[in-house]
Curated annotation (Swiss-Prot):
One of its GO terms (molecular function) is ferrous iron binding. Keywords: Aromatic hydrocarbons catabolism, Dioxygenase, Iron, Oxidoreductase. The active site is at 118 (proton donor), 182 (proton acceptor). Pathway: Aromatic compound metabolism; 3-phenylpropanoate degradation. The gene is mhpB. This is 2,3-dihydroxyphenylpropionate/2,3-dihydroxicinnamic acid 1,2-dioxygenase. Catalyzes the non-heme iron(II)-dependent oxidative cleavage of 2,3-dihydroxyphenylpropionic acid and 2,3-dihydroxicinnamic acid into 2-hydroxy-6-ketononadienedioate and 2-hydroxy-6-ketononatrienedioate, respectively. Homotetramer.
């Protein structure tokens, strides 16, 4: 069997891309960058997609919070107007991937009924128009629910997935979804009120009113943040650019020593979503040296995020 061809697209996500508030100029600039990534993906024409993505207490909860999980079946929950319903997950390929990762000494959970949110489906919809357009293996990386594992294990996960993908004889696109610096209003075990605690621990479904209230709160938090008010940690463009330089230049081993507390202190609690980028780039790097092509970055307070996009192929 011929060796697989692997390509990469990493991009930030934001529910605010689908909500009122951001300036049209900002949305137009991001749409232009996404269009370039979409053209890259269309030209590559993947036969299989592997997503590395976080969750925002929509599919994974403290009742059992794995560091990593591979889905053999998955459904979008439809949050913030994103895709609701099943994804096209090839269960046999996903199971084989999980088995290969375990054989590479990386402990990964398996889900035969994974729920995924905008962190997974928004990039699929932006790149393909439809979240079900391509067969996809979803890989969850806990990036929110502390305590978090060491970054070096994320790189090991990506490398193990990449080593397996190389054996499939397919054109495979790996997607990393999230980041960069940002600190949105996310409940924690220490601070969540009772209703939110029931959700993040037990997965108690949100009512329609609760979902609407959360959406309104996110819009208001972004409005305050963009105007320089509120209590959210500021974006850190310098940190973002330093991280992008690391992935652009293939110096992935440098992240192995990063301290989790340092990441949150420098770039916000949800900056840990860069774990998805690290895993995706590690999967690509398992094929050899690579070069990044489409490069976009903008600090976007209106999205409460340092918003970035990268595409890459092996050389």
């Amino acid at each position: 069997m011929a060796k697989s061809q692997i390509a990469l697209c990493c991009m930030s996500h934001s529910p605010l891309l689908n909500l009122p508030g951001p300036a049209q100029e900002l949305l137009d600039e991001i749409d232009k960058a996404i269009a370039a990534a979409r053209d890259f993906v269309a030209e590559f024409d993947p036969e299989l997609v592997v997503t590395f993505s976080p969750d925002h207490y929509n599919g994974f909860f403290y009742r059992a919070m794995p560091p990593f999980c591979i889905g053999t079946a998955a459904e979008g929950v439809g949050d913030y107007g994103t895709h609701e319903g099943p994804l096209d997950v090839p269960s046999d390929l996903a199971t084989d991937c999980a088995r290969a990762v375990l054989d590479h000494d990386v402990d990964v959970a398996l889900s035969a009924a994974m729920d995924v949110d905008h962190g997974t489906v928004q990039p699929l919809q932006k790149l393909f128009g439809d979240a079900t357009a391509k067969p996809v293996i979803p890989v969850f990386i806990n990036s929110v629910a502390t305590p978090l594992g060491p970054i070096r294990r994320v790189r090991a996960l990506g490398a193990a997935v990449g080593a397996h993908l190389a054996t499939l004889g397919k054109r495979v696109l790996v997607i990393g979804s999230g980041g960069l610096s940002h600190d949105p209003p996310v409940p924690t075990l220490a601070t969540a009120p009772p209703a939110a605690l029931d959700r993040i621990v037990r997965g108690v479904p949100m009512t329609t009113d609760q979902r609407q209230a959360r959406q309104t709160a996110v819009i208001e938090a972004a409005r305050e943040f963009a105007s320089g008010r509120g209590t959210l940690a500021p974006l850190n463009p310098d940190w973002d650019r330093a991280f992008l330089d690391i992935v652009d230049s293939g110096r992935l081993a440098e992240v192995d020593g990063w301290d989790n507390g340092w990441i949150a202190e420098q770039a916000g609690n949800s900056a840990h979503e860069v774990r998805t980028w690290i895993a995706a780039f590690a999967a690509l790097a398992a094929q050899g040296e690579y070069v990044t092509e489409n490069r976009f970055y903008r600090a976007a307070p209106e999205l409460i995020a340092g918003f970035a996009i990268r595409t890459a192929v092996t050389t």
